[in-house]
Amino acid sequence: MDWISIILLVLLALGVIGNNATVSIAVAILLLMRLLSLERYFPLLEQHGLQLGIIILTIGIMTPLASGKINPSSFLEIFTNWHSLLAVAVGMFVAYLAGKGTVLMSQNPLIVTGLLLGTIAGVTFFRGVAVGPLIAAGILAFILQFLPK
């Protein structure tokens, strides 16, 4: 067994121990692809996987609107409640951070592994919630801009 498979198995174990289904499923799929000699598709996943994942996530977030569970009058209430206005501002800031995270992750794949391990450790040992490496990368990019290179 090669080192990459061993590392993936360790990540799979951490995902299972940490009760992180997203990481567990993703790593299991990658391991399965390696076992079935489907590595030729890895460049395609590297190039388009993040964008495809964001599209699927966005569809999931917008489904309540499309299904009618969120009615149009709710949008007017956003501008009459300071909690909702703050939610809009925080949403904008997090989207900004995610954009910075996307750039950082594409420029330095090693950071992705560190963020993934940190997320798994946070879920496993601190009862955290996996908010995703993308936002973590955005926060890291935000912090790094203030530190010497």
Curated annotation (Swiss-Prot):
Keyword Transport recorded:
no
- The membrane-spanning stretches of this chain are 3-23, 48-68, 85-105, 106-126, 128-148
Q: Where in the cell is it found?
A: Cell membrane
The record's keywords, sorted A to Z, are: Cell membrane, Membrane, Transmembrane, Transmembrane helix
Could you tell me which InterPro entries the record lists for this protein? UPF0756_TM
Q: How does it sit in the membrane?
A: Multi-pass membrane protein
Annotated Gene Ontology cellular component terms: plasma membrane
Similarity-based family: Belongs to the UPF0756 family.
Query: PANTHER family, per this entry?
Result: UPF0756 MEMBRANE PROTEIN YEAL
What is the protein name stated in its UniProt record?
UPF0756 membrane protein BBR47_32760
Species of origin: Brevibacillus brevis (strain 47 / JCM 6285 / NBRC 100599)
